[in-house]
């Protein structure tokens, strides 16, 4: 297998990034399907992928060396940047999935044979252009719409993506830990690689937030019975407006059975064939992955706010009027199949509600059949909180 190298005159950098998944079309760049009105009428103006936003900021900073363009940016124009290449993320998150820390690498052309970009200048410059690009685009849309703000701009896009840190990537070639995935005849990976955000990641940690509440859900008035805006999911947001798009809200009269969930989680920990928990369209040839740990914790809703924790825990932990709690499911593993984490959480939530017994989880796992497992948890409750690269910290 050939070695993967970056071109002469380019230097590889490793970045960490955080983002609000609600405001983005997932991580991966989607070309002409971003910042547009789709064929079915969906208004995606000013809506981009995380990668699309970063590429546009790179285009303004690196290709133009900071020169501001006269016309508003469009992400589908920034794929041809001649001064950066080989953009690779460690974890390609879906639309509405948040990240407290994801990592990626790219190769940036050196200013001359001896002068490369300083990491801190890249961080400051990219964040500057991420904000300015969003402002310019919003202003252009407002001008075109004569001041009428489209629904997708109700949430400001200026603060949805931020570069956290940047470092020059290690120079040495590394063994590719995915080289032995699958039979030799189907191997498409090189045996050794330059530092790569995806293939050198040693662990990924996700946290899923579930809001379990017992508040009565108001019913739509008769006059609004035919109003499609009164959907059950919207009515369930009643009483918890700050959790909209931040957690999976489940209305349940009884507390989740954490002991049963933990018992089920123990059966999922370790190295297994997770075919029953892989998403449709998963391209990975080998469904075997390793889960290092699954931690489950419940916290009264008000106690999830740190400044209220001590007082609320003392006065209200056993109070029957405490109508909600946050359940967090933390899953750490070396790699995951497409939508594996959300499928695992959906199964654990079923167990917590008593709809599936802990002992049945092992049978679901051994069945290697996605149809045997419960429904997948929604995307907006999922957070990628950390990606580790061995001894190399970003």
Pin down the residues of each PLM region.
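Structured-RNA-binding interfaces characteristic of tRNA pseudouridine synthases
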Residues: 2-316, 321-394
């Amino acid at each position: 297998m050939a070695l993967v190298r970056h071109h002469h005159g380019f230097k590889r950098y490793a970045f960490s990034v955080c983002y609000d998944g609600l405001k983005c079309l997932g991580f991966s760049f989607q070309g002409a399907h971003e910042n547009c009105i789709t064929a079915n009428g969906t208004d995606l103006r000013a809506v981009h992928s995380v990668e699309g936003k970063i590429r546009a900021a790179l285009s303004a900073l690196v290709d133009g060396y900071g020169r501001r363009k006269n016309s508003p940016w469009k992400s589908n124009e920034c794929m041809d940047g001649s001064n950066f290449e080989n953009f690779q993320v460690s974890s390609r998150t879906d639309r509405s999935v948040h990240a407290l820390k994801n990592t990626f690498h790219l190769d940036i052309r050196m200013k001359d044979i001896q002068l490369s970009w300083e990491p801190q200048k890249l961080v400051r410059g990219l964040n500057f252009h991420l904000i300015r690009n969003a402002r310019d685009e919003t202003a252009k849309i407002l001008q075109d719409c004569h001041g009428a703000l489209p629904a997708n701009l109700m949430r400001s896009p200026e603060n949805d993506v931020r570069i956290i840190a940047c470092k020059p990537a290690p120079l040495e070639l590394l063994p590719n830990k995915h080289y032995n995935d699958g039979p030799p005849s189907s191997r498409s990976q090189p045996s050794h690689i330059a530092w790569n955000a995806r293939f050198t990641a040693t662990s990924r940690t996700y946290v899923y937030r579930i809001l379990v509440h017992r508040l009565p859900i108001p019913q739509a008035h008769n006059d609004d019975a035919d109003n499609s805006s009164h959907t059950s999911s919207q009515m369930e947001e009643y009483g918890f407006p700050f959790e909209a798009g931040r957690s999976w809200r489940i209305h349940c009269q009884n507390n989740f059975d954490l002991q049963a969930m933990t018992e089920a989680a123990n059966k999922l920990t370790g190295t297994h064939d997770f075919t029953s928990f892989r998403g449709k369209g998963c391209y990975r040839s080998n469904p075997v992955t390793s889960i290092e740990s699954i931690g489950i914790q419940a916290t009264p809703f008000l106690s999830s706010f740190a400044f209220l924790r001590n007082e609320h825990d003392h006065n209200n932990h056993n109070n029957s009027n405490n109508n909600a709690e946050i359940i967090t499911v933390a899953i750490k593993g070396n790699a995951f199949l497409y939508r594996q984490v959300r499928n695992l959480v959906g199964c654990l939530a079923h167990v917590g509600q008593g709809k599936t017994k802990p002992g049945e989880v092992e049978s679901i796992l051994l069945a290697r059949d996605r149809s045997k497992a419960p429904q997948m948890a929604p995307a907006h409750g999922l957070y990628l909180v950390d990606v580790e690269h061995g001894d190399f910290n970003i």
